[in-house]
């Protein structure tokens, strides 16, 4: 499994990238708006930091507009992946963008049926939203469990990005189920890094060393 970071905050991206563990970035209009900065500038900054796929989402809702917006976004940097919502017009846009050699990430996926249609349209990635399904008392991870064998059965090259990650267990289970990627908020990434026994063990090692280092 690969780990992407789900944020538009450049400082968070720098910090995560310095750890040497992230392979890409996902953003969305809400994350961009939270930064209160020019969209293109943020995407260009991210592309200068991370050498991997960077998902940037369209805000149009008709296929021709999504395609035009996607072409414009893709021109910013070769690593840009166009995020397209899982709607009928979105599938049309995915088909056209894919035909032009532009990578796509179909977002707001909440069922295996939606993921199947996105793969058939030629999506590079699909992003099932685990946490949002959990929020309405559905099993978000079950959707990943449903998608993985379908894609394997028919040899789809579309990669599965576990999205809407709320806690480290989501990442662990998505990895266990066979998702290709988990896109993780910075806060959850830091939670994955830490364990109280690691801190306790390190403190003990250092304390023991202090007792003998000058002997």
UniProtKB/Swiss-Prot annotation:
Subcellular location(s) of the protein: Cytoplasm
EC numbers: 2.2.1.2
PROSITE patterns associated with the record: TRANSALDOLASE_1
SUPFAM superfamilies attached to this UniProt entry: Aldolase
Gene3D superfamilies, A to Z: Aldolase class I
Reactions listed under catalytic activity: D-sedoheptulose 7-phosphate + D-glyceraldehyde 3-phosphate = D-erythrose 4-phosphate + beta-D-fructose 6-phosphate
Primary location class: cytoplasm
Catalytic residues (positions): 83 (schiff-base intermediate with substrate)
GO molecular function, one term: transaldolase activity
Pathway as given in its UniProt record: Carbohydrate degradation; pentose phosphate pathway; D-glyceraldehyde 3-phosphate and beta-D-fructose 6-phosphate from D-ribose 5-phosphate and D-xylulose 5-phosphate (non-oxidative stage): step 2/3
Entry GO CC: cytoplasm
Any GO BP annotation: carbohydrate metabolic process
Swiss-Prot/TrEMBL keywords: Cytoplasm, Pentose shunt, Schiff base, Transferase
Highest taxon listed in the record's lineage: Bacteria
Record InterPro entries: Aldolase_TIM (IPR013785), TAL/FSA (IPR001585), Transaldolase_3B (IPR022999), Transaldolase_3B/F6P_aldolase (IPR004731), Transaldolase_AS (IPR018225), TSA/FSA_arc/bac (IPR033919)
Function noted in UniProt: Transaldolase is important for the balance of metabolites in the pentose-phosphate pathway.
HAMAP family to which the protein is assigned, alphabetical: Transaldolase_3b
Similarity comment: family membership: Belongs to the transaldolase family. Type 3B subfamily.
Protein name listed in UniProt: Probable transaldolase
Lineage: Bacteria, Bacillati, Bacillota, Clostridia, Moorellales
Name of the gene encoding the protein in the UniProt record: tal
